[in-house]
Amino acid sequence: MSVKPIFFALDGKHLDNFSRELEILKGNIYGVKVGLEMFTSEGPSSVEKLKKDGWTVFLDLKLHDIPNTVQAAAISAGNIGADYLTIHIASGKEALLAAKESKSENLKLLGVSSALTSKAYSPEISQKVYEEFLLAKESKIDGVICPPSELVKTKELFELIVTPGIRLKNDDSHD
């Protein structure tokens, strides 16, 4: 079986709760996503342990702060071995540039649009997402988190595009 370009979301507080899944998925998927809940519960050791076990790690913290703080966080994420890091595009061009300039060579920055947190999707939201993606492109970050509905336009701007997991119509959201 070839490796699938999929990140498995470790959405929970404790890495140990995912040991069975990680064992099954090892070598079959591209990597794992560590979210804010796990990172604030277990800290950098969660990323360091996953890297030690050979995983590609997507650190989904959605940074949104002043340029100096975003820059320092990007440096820290690279230092603990994260391969991907999310940053809110709404942090602004200065913050995006600061993160890009200071990050480690191996860390890829992924922009997140603040408009994507809305449950109701409309042409106005689509336009807002596109405008934020243009700012991300100007800031030379590596890629974006993109809803499937925006893929066609986004492919004109970025090669590195990550789409969130897609929930089936009848699935419980557990959000």
Which residue ranges define each predicted feature?
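Active-site flanking residues adjacent to catalytic metal/cofactor-binding acidic residues
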Residues: 10, 59-61, 164
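Residue-level signature of catalytic and energy-coupling elements of molecular machines
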Residues: 8, 62, 136
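Short helix-capping segments at alpha-helix termini
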Residues: 1, 27-28, 52-55, 103-107
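N-terminal glycine-rich anion-binding loop in soluble enzyme alpha/beta folds
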Residues: 1-24
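Metabolite-binding pocket within alpha/beta catalytic cores that recognizes anionic/polar moieties
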Residues: 29-84
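Conserved anion-binding
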Residues: 2-3, 65-162, 166-173
